[in-house]
């Protein structure tokens, strides 16, 4: 709410342009209906930011690419994996000692990017959910034995997914 108020204040003070910088896009996981009578809150947030007067949004690791399509203004989706890759390269990690692991199928693209840039192997945890926010790691696809594992995820909420993937 404070971001919306600030954007409105800037526009009322004759700001030529306002870029909303959003490190964490709240409600990003509500990007589609999963049951009847459910709001698509990620779209509502996009509408509110636009109505408040934002001309551009700079976001970090949006949960899904379709969120960019919810806006009628420019959206830059910056990937934190770029920073991680840069750090790992500077620390001279050996590719044969690393394995990029996605804790679920939805994060494979991020893990694949990291693996490609670091020239290392990749693994994927096949995750299922039995209840809301309760993940169960079922199978590991790939080999992580004797590797330094880099678990790559976009949102850590309860840390259930990433903890179970690590175990």
What does each model-found stretch correspond to?
Residues 1-167:
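PRPP-associated nucleotide enzymes
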